[in-house]
Amino acid sequence: MSTVQTVLGTITPNLLGRTLTHEHVALDFEHFYRPPPPDFESELKAKISMSTLGYVRLYPYSSKENVRFYDGEALEAAKKDVLLYKKHGGGSIVENSSYGLKRNLEFIVELAKSTGVHFIAGTGHYIHAMQDASHASLTVEQMSDLYSKDIITGLQVNGKVVKCGFIGEVASVYPIHDFEKNAIKAAGEIQEVLGCGVSMHPHRVTKAPFEIMRLYLEAGGRADKCVMSHLDRTIFDIDELLEFAKLGCYIQYDLFGTECSFYQLNTSVDMISDGQRIDNLIKLIKEGLVDKLLMSHDIHTKHRLTSYGGHGYHHIHTNILPRMFDRGVTLEQVEQMTVTNPAKWLAFDP
């Protein structure tokens, strides 16, 4: 029987329910801090409040408080929003914080126990620039050993063993750094052996997802167990996205709720809106790809939590799905994207 490995133990895939496949409940995103525009420096250095929130929404990576998604206030706000997610029909959350993002397994376990939401934790490596000295020079073999131990043996958290349930997010820049190539290859090798799910984070250029999949597939990884994240900010042309879809991995639109007039992490492109995300998913559904689609928010800054004026983890359930139904998407198709596909991806399938 197939199983899914949560932080509290294994369950059968049918128990997951509605699942967000790419979220964070605690991480350190200070690496991506950007100096504020001189005109708004004082507002963005101030504590987040109603009088400064508008500036933070425009320049989210220019507020140090906003990218410190790990302090006590952030954890309290994240827990509140996980409870709201549960209230509005959420069943599971896939926590994508990997090595380099300062994953907080203790907090993830506490959330799983206190909220009743299933949490699946990831192993793997984020970009090379965010690794400490103990990880920055790891070989493919060392990474493979680490990932397999995190999944099979588990890690000690307050005297108890907690096991990771997938590899991800495995992140890379472009051109892909040699360290990141090693991480992608290690993910492919371990996926082939264990049958686990894998989640990739591409850089913000169209070529990146294609190159990642080439490295992953050459290492032995299965396409049908791999998620390509952040495609709603990476491949904007639908025809090119359809070409990428031929590789057979999951197509993930995971920035729902991110609507901004200025995308700080790639100023050469305009971030699409939730309405455009819905329209693109409908186009992909019409192309017969509903069994390859996933949806999430990738919450990683405070201003996206409701305590800070944001939308929270329940945004897709309460605001997006009703709009999709209004535009002709069926309940069966929504269940496929939010329940069936996540369960198939997360189920261990050697």
Swiss-Prot record:
Binds 2 divalent metal cations per subunit. A divalent metal cation 1 binds at H22, H24, E169, D298. GO terms for molecular function: hydrolase activity, acting on ester bonds; zinc ion binding. PROSITE patterns: PHOSPHOTRIESTERASE_1, PHOSPHOTRIESTERASE_2. InterPro entries: AryldialkylPase_Zn-BS, Metal_Hydrolase, Phosphotriesterase. It is an enzyme of class 3 (hydrolase). Its EC number is 3.1.-.-. A divalent metal cation 2 binds at E169, H201, H230. Its cofactor is a divalent metal cation. Pfam families: PTE. GO terms for biological process: catabolic process. Keywords: Hydrolase, Metal-binding. PANTHER family: PHOSPHOTRIESTERASE-RELATED, PHOSPHOTRIESTERASE-RELATED PROTEIN. Belongs to the metallo-dependent hydrolases superfamily. Phosphotriesterase family. This is Phosphotriesterase-related protein. It comes from Drosophila melanogaster.
